[in-house]
Amino acid sequence: LSNHHNPTPPILLTIAGFDPSCGAGIAADLKTFAAHNCYGVAAVAALTVQSAQGVESTHVTPAATLRAELDALAADVPIVAVKIGMLGNKANAAVVAEFLDRGGFAHVVLDPVVKATAGGADLLDAAGVKFLADELLKRANVVTPNIAEAELLTGIEIKDLAAMEAAAKKLVERGARAVVVKGGHMEKAIDVLFDGAEVLTLGGERVKSENTHGSGCTFASAITAQLASGRPLHEAVLLAKAYVTKAIEKGFAIGKGPGPLDHFYRIHHEPPPRGVHEVPQHGMHPPAEPALR
């Protein structure tokens, strides 16, 4: 058998923080990319001390190290899309902005991670938040804030669908090309997509599950993968929402806090690949005896 001529899948880059429980951050991004038949590479912008119960502390990667990570990847592999998550501080946000300017990537999805959902720890300093709003928004194809992040970036108090739409429009006014305001923390599982021309309200079944750790990271990564695979924006967002909904439904508990999503629910019940089968015991050759010396 030879694999020399297998086609290379789309190569996607995540720039984010590392979660040791692997429910959120880079681990969630890479699992999502793989589940969408893409190959993921990663630049670690921060290490976090956390579990599903919350973030205890963060350790931001020095800007020079993050720049070196990005340069090493860009010099070696053809990155077609970038997903941005936790950056930690303004210095790292500036490194990412410079990298995007040099890279000319087809798709950039910005998940403006500011605070941890569990525990509320700060994941981006105040100067970084301002830089994100002033500089990174306009470098992204899609921005995916949750309610709290949209409120922080726009100053709009969001209590209903109309306020979600207003926040999405304001973020586009500030430079984003398209915005998805995630309503997962509201009473109904409704998201709002604004592409600069029209508003699309995305309804969905609210899954009764506590296993939602990393759902925001997963959603942004799924959008990235769908865009990189050639889907138009509206279809990419709808497919990403459907994927996350099912992954939450199939999620499982691993510890004392909210469990992770099942990023690979699609393959758990698939038949084995063609050509793979069980070999009867009598058809196997006995192990060779070691050679005497």
Regions found by a protein language model. Name each.
Residues 32, 151-152, 209-233:
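Short, small-residue alpha-helix embedded
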